[in-house]
Amino acid sequence: MKVELVRVNDAFHFEGSGSSEVKVHTDGSPDIGGSNLGVRPMELLLMGLASCSAIDVVLILKKQRQDITDFRIITEGDREEEPDTKRKPFRKIHLLFKFAGNQLDENKINRAIALSMEKYCSATAQMEALATITYSVEIASV
C-alpha cells in the first residue's frame, strides 16, 4: 500500500491520496496555525479504525439480509502523553456501534461486530497492539 501527502498551503493543510485516488484533507489545529481545512491526523486514525470495521459489519449483515436503515459508529480515543516526548498516542479506544432497522437480529449484529473486531479488520489488528480497544452496541427498531 502506498499513499501520497501533498502540502496545500504554507501552513498545515495537506491533501492525501492513495490507490483509490480519493482525496482526503488534513490540517493542524488553529492553536498551532492550522485553518480547520481538514481533519486532524489522530481523528483520521479513529475514522480509519471505525471505517474498517463498518465495511466488514455491513458486508456481513447484507449477506444475512438484515434491513439496516441507519448505522453509525461513534469512536472515542483516550490519549496519554509519553514521558520525555510530546507524543500522545491512543491508549484506550471505544467504538459504539449504533444500528436502526426493521426486525434486526441482535445475535447477528453482535456476531458481525465480533468477527470484524477479532478476525477481519486489519486496522483493529494494527491498533490493538498499542491501545486497548473495546466496543458496545445499541440497536433501535424502526
Question: What is each residue range found by the language model?
Answer:
Residues M1-M47, V58-V142:
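Extended beta-strand/beta-hairpin segments
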